Regions:
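Acidic glycine-/aspartate-rich tracts in secreted/extracellular proteins
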Residues: 63-64, 120, 135-138
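Short hydrophobic beta/alpha edge segments that flank linear recognition/processing sites
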Residues: 70-71, 107-122, 130
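Surface-exposed, glycine-biased beta-strand/turn segments
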Residues: 1-69, 78-80, 108-109, 122
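Sec/Tat-exported extracytoplasmic proteins
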Residues: 46, 62, 117, 150-154
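Acidic, glycine-rich catalytic/binding loops that coordinate metals and/or anionic ligands
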Residues: 2-14, 83-86, 99-111, 127, ...
Length: 180
């Protein structure tokens, strides 16, 4: 049975705090032998509450030597009129998230998910490094621009979902051309 679903995304921190965008490849990155930036950075003080981008589930929790403490969640977004579920990863967090969340826990969009920090060797000071893609373990899998995904659904959009696997976006019926 079809049901109506409203999809909305949220910036994890104030958009005015964006300090480095996806795909940038400035002189500092080049001097360090790094490729283009694989995420979106929000310059925030350590301990700043970070919001869940959308309603979904916790998909992965852990720590890497480079990106520090992290949590990855799934969240629906609408891209080019199509509902897609993406993975969003929050990195350089203040602490291990396994004390607060378990894989599979539901997450509500806009709620406090975690707190920013400065963990991991790649951190250049307190900030959130946000990544997005299709699969968990975003540090080693293909990524895409998180800002484009967030901004596509900042305004709530209601869609009709036929079943969990086959969402359908209802579009207004096309107007028939007037007869001459």
């Amino acid at each position: 049975m079809p049901k109506q679903v409203t999809v909305q995304t949220f910036h994890p921190a104030k958009p005015s705090r964006i300090s480095d965008k996806f795909g940038t490849h400035g002189e500092t990155r080049k001097k360090l032998g790094l490729g283009p930036h694989r995420g979106l950075d929000y310059s925030v003080q350590s301990g700043t509450p970070l919001l869940a981008i959308g309603s979904g589930r916790v998909k992965n929790i852990g720590e890497t030597s480079v990106l520090g403490y992290f949590i990855e969640i799934s969240a629906p977004v609408i891209v080019k009129g199509k509902l897609e579920v993406k993975i969003f990863g929050y990195y350089h967090l203040a602490e291990d998230q396994s004390a607060h969340w378990k894989v599979g826990d539901p997450v509500k969009g806009g709620e406090v998910l975690c707190k920013s920090g400065n963990s991991g060797s790649a951190s250049s000071g307190p900030h959130l490094h946000l990544m997005a893609g299709e699969k968990i373990n975003l540090a080693t899998n293909p990524v895409e621009d998180p800002l484009a995904l967030i901004e596509a659904t900042l305004t709530p959009q209601t869609i009709t979902v036929e079943d969990e696997e086959k969402p359908v976006v209802k579009k207004p019926a096309a107007k028939k051309p007037a007869k001459k």
